[in-house]
Amino acid sequence: MSNTGITLALSKGRIFDETLPLLAAAGITPAESPESSRKLIIGTNRDDVRLIIVRASDVPTYVQYGAADLGIAGKDVLNEHGGRGLYQPLDLQIAKCRMMVAVREGYDYAGTVKQGARIRVATKYVNAARDHFASKGVHIDLIKLYGSMELAPLVGLSDVIVDLVSTGGTLKANGLAAVEHICDISSRLVVNQAALKLKRSVIQPVVDAFAAAVAR
């Protein structure tokens, strides 16, 4: 990408699908769908804009190091990354869900916390979990997992989990229940701070178009 062109980092799935109307508002149409193409670099109807398809958890890193000028990432991912080198101008209000503490049915979470007992927590959101329980004065042992979080309490790996919840259907199907709300999650637009200075004439109109679309 030239000094006048921009690269936008996106992940497949729900975030990409819900970003399409925002891209359209900015006059950007992907040449292909990442769901049907194996390409990781996708052109658009604009010669000065291209998309790169990366793992959701990697979006902030690509933007931080300048491999992408902009990206769209969930608040959960940004919390774990730390936000270094990133400007976060806009909450896009897409891919909404909640970060929750969940337990197996029958586990006395409130009683355990009240007694001051140490709790074993399984999650991939270790920073968010650590901060949440520290704010409550609860001592925990953290176990980092990358998937199938619901299994951990069922097989005795953990007492509780911290995970994202949309409808709660997956928790219920596995005999778990959400017991505590940590924070609301949605996706944010992130911009490389250096790129914003160097390419403001190209980046700012995209940011403004996204903002206008969100405000509608």
From Swiss-Prot:
Major enzyme class: transferase
One Gene Ontology cellular component annotation held by this UniProt entry: cytoplasm
Subcellular location, record wording: Cytoplasm
Record's catalysed reaction(s): 1-(5-phospho-beta-D-ribosyl)-ATP + diphosphate = 5-phospho-alpha-D-ribose 1-diphosphate + ATP
Alphabetized UniProt keyword annotations: Amino-acid biosynthesis, ATP-binding, Cytoplasm, Glycosyltransferase, Histidine biosynthesis, Nucleotide-binding, Transferase
Transmembrane segments annotated in the record for this chain: none
Molecular function GO labels: ATP binding; ATP phosphoribosyltransferase activity
Pfam families per record: HisG
Annotated PROSITE patterns: ATP_P_PHORIBOSYLTR
Pathway(s): Amino-acid biosynthesis; L-histidine biosynthesis; L-histidine from 5-phospho-alpha-D-ribose 1-diphosphate: step 1/9
EC number(s) stated in the UniProt entry for this protein: 2.4.2.17
GO biological process: L-histidine biosynthetic process
UniProt key word ATP-binding: yes
Subunit composition and interactions: Heteromultimer composed of HisG and HisZ subunits.
Function summary: Catalyzes the condensation of ATP and 5-phosphoribose 1-diphosphate to form N'-(5'-phosphoribosyl)-ATP (PR-ATP). Has a crucial role in the pathway because the rate of histidine biosynthesis seems to be controlled primarily by regulation of HisG enzymatic activity.
Domain comment in the entry: Lacks the C-terminal regulatory region which is replaced by HisZ.
Similarity annotation: Belongs to the ATP phosphoribosyltransferase family. Short subfamily.
Protein name from the UniProt record: ATP phosphoribosyltransferase
Organism: Thiobacillus denitrificans (strain ATCC 25259 / T1)
Origin organism lineage: Bacteria, Pseudomonadati, Pseudomonadota, Betaproteobacteria, Nitrosomonadales
